[in-house]
C-alpha cells in the first residue's frame, strides 16, 4: 500500500474529487495548506508598507491505495490538476506499513 499526497491548486479540488470517485477511490483526506516554491507570490501594501506575500493557498489531497493502483492514481492526478503553469503542485508517494479500520478492526487492503 502507498499513501499519495498531492498538493494542488484550490481551483482543481472539485475536478479531482470527481475523478477520484469515478476511478473508485472513495476515501480521501483534504486539507487547506499554504506553500511556496517556484511560483512566486505578490506584493501588497498594508498601512503604507510593502508586504511580500509568498505563501500561497493550496489544497493537499491524501489517499491510500493498493500498490497496483499507484501509477494510475498519480496519472489521474496529473491529468486532472495540470494547467501547464508554474504552481500546478507536487505529488509525493510514501510506503504504508499497515492500515487498520478502527470500527471493524479490518487490516490491510480491506481497511482502505
Task: Report residues per predicted region.
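Positively charged, small/polar-rich N-terminal and surface patches that mediate targeting and assembly
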Residues: 1-112
Amino acid at each position: 500500500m502507498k499513501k499519495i499526497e498531492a498538493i494542488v491548486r484550490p481551483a482543481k479540488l472539485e475536478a479531482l474529487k470527481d475523478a477520484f470517485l469515478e476511478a473508485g477511490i472513495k476515501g480521501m483526506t483534504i486539507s487547506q495548506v499554504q506553500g511556496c516554491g517556484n511560483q512566486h507570490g505578490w506584493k501588497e501594501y498594508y498601512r503604507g508598507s510593502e508586504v511580500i506575500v509568498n505563501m500561497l493557498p493550496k489544497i493537499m489531497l491524501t489517499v491510500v491505495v493498493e500498490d497496483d493502483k499507484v501509477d494510475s492514481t498519480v496519472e489521474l492526478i496529473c491529468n486532472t490538476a495540470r494547467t501547464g503553469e508554474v504552481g500546478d503542485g507536487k505529488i509525493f508517494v510514501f510506503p504504508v506499513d499497515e492500515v487498520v479500520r478502527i470500527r471493524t478492526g479490518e487490516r490491510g487492503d480491506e481497511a482502505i
